[in-house]
Regions:
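N-terminal intrinsically disordered, low-complexity, charge/repeat-rich segments that act as generic
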Residues: 3-125
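Basic/aromatic-rich interaction segments and small domains that mediate binding to polyanionic partners
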Residues: 29-57, 95, 100-103, 143-155, ...
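Solvent-exposed, non-transmembrane amphipathic alpha-helical segments
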Residues: 76, 80, 91, 116, ...
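Short N-terminal segments
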Residues: 9-19, 134, 139, 145, ...
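Short, structured beta-strand/loop micro-motifs enriched in basic residues and often containing a Trp
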Residues: 120-124, 131-145, 167-170
């Protein structure tokens, strides 16, 4: 069986030698237990307000005041207490409120009042009108970019994920390298060209596109005591996270 990156939660601990990471990096953490899969007839939104939370996040993001990477990092910056007690969409709304204030779109007082208290930034041209929503959702946010950075690996190469795991540009910054993959050896399955590097883009340091690869790992290379050690896991990994095996 081959698994993609999404939804990889496991009862087993991470591979030996993996360092600790921030709370949001939950793949393979010990003690969280298995995640029961949703049934085929499960509703898209468990509660009505979940749909509104998604709509608010998309409409606010369309204002162009931050990147997707920055919004992810904003949610990662929630206090550990809030992160553990909030539901999925509560994390979204709390991170959204924080980033709206941080970027000057609104103020804390306006959040509390539930209305505008001063002249708002002129963002009317970026307003996501209803007739544009479907097109915006279907087109997504392409991250493929031209880059002068040379790809160091080819399909079939054996690679090792670097152990550092942290953002090398910003202390405590955003990283898309999951803890459970650090130090693991895998094989390059696909090369996707150069894509926006989240470690840089999340902090306003530019898109800094880097080569992006799909790397396949044996499950046993990621988790000791894997129930099905010959299963494979495929992760999309940027070049700065990799080194030759």
């Amino acid at each position: 069986m081959r698994l993609g990156q999404s939804g990889l939660h496991d009862r087993h601990g991470p591979a030996a030698g993996a360092e600790m990471s921030r709370l949001h990096d939950m793949g393979g953490r010990i003690g969280d237990g298995p995640l029961p899969p949703e049934t085929a007839d499960a509703p898209v939104f468990a509660k009505d307000w979940h749909a509104r939370a998604l709509a608010l996040t998309l409409a606010s993001g369309a204002l162009g005041q931050w990147s997707l990477d920055r919004s992810r990092h904003q949610r990662e910056c929630l206090s550990p207490q809030d992160y553990m007690r909030f539901s999925y969409y509560e994390k979204w709304l709390s991170g959204l409120a924080d980033i709206l204030v941080a970027t000057g779109v609104l103020t804390t007082d306006e959040l509390k009042a539930g209305r505008s208290l001063s002249a708002a930034p002129d963002l009317t041209q970026r307003c996501l009108k209803s007739e544009r929503v479907q097109k915006a959702l279907s087109s997504g946010g392409p991250t493929l970019r031209d880059s002068q950075t040379v790809a160091q690996f080819e399909v079939g190469d054996r690679v090792i994920v670097r152990r550092f795991g942290h953002n090398s540009l910003v202390a405590g910054g955003h990283s898309r390298l999951p803890r459970y993959a650090r130090g693991a050896e895998g094989q390059v399955l696909n090369y996707h060209g150069a894509h926006i590097f989240p470690d840089s883009n999340a902090h306003g340091l530019g898109e800094a596109p880097e080569p992006l690869y799909s790397v396949v790992f044996l499950r046993s290379a990621l988790w000791s005591g894997a129930e099905h050690p010959d299963d494979e896991v495929v992760l999309d990994i940027w070049q700065p996270y990799l080194q030759p095996a």
